[in-house]
Amino acid sequence: MARIAGVDIPNDKRVVISLTYVYGIGLATSKKILAAAGVSEDIRVKDLTNDQEDAIRREVDAIKVEGDLRREVNLNIKRLMEIGSYRGIRHRRGLPVRGQNTKNNARTRKGKAVAIAGKKK
């Protein structure tokens, strides 16, 4: 298994797919990385030469991925909560942030439904 940005990427898959195992790299970014590194998308990870691996590593190192990206996202959410913006308040209360209705659904964000004692009559 090749190791890129601290992540073991699978050997038996195509490089374009294997790169998406790194947090912060999707299919579009993966294709851009391979084009910049001059590596074919169809080649398998196990068939990469050391020079090709190094070229891919250099391109990935130029992008914010894995721990750095997770840290930045968490700091952005913390900043929203500290300044008291609407989105920050929704994050703090554990409610949907992007305008979804909460009357009936939003169970993923709100958690399991809790019964209220004495409600039924």
From Swiss-Prot:
Pfam families: Ribosomal_S13 (PF00416). Residues 106-121 have a biased composition (Basic residues). One of its GO terms (cellular component) is cytosol. GO terms for molecular function: rRNA binding; structural constituent of ribosome; tRNA binding. GO terms for biological process: translation. InterPro entries: Rbsml_uS13_C, Ribosomal_uS13, Ribosomal_uS13-like_H2TH, Ribosomal_uS13_bac-type, Ribosomal_uS13_CS. Coiled coil: none annotated. Residues 95-121 are annotated as: Disordered. Belongs to the universal ribosomal protein uS13 family. Part of the 30S ribosomal subunit. Forms a loose heterodimer with protein S19. Forms two bridges to the 50S subunit in the 70S ribosome. This is Small ribosomal subunit protein uS13. Located at the top of the head of the 30S subunit, it contacts several helices of the 16S rRNA. In the 70S ribosome it contacts the 23S rRNA (bridge B1a) and protein L5 of the 50S subunit (bridge B1b), connecting the 2 subunits; these bridges are implicated in subunit movement. Contacts the tRNAs in the A and P-sites. The lineage of its organism: Bacteria, Bacillati, Bacillota, Bacilli, Lactobacillales. HAMAP family: Ribosomal_uS13. Keywords: Ribonucleoprotein, Ribosomal protein, RNA-binding, rRNA-binding, tRNA-binding. It comes from the Bacteria. It comes from Streptococcus thermophilus (strain ATCC BAA-250 / LMG 18311).
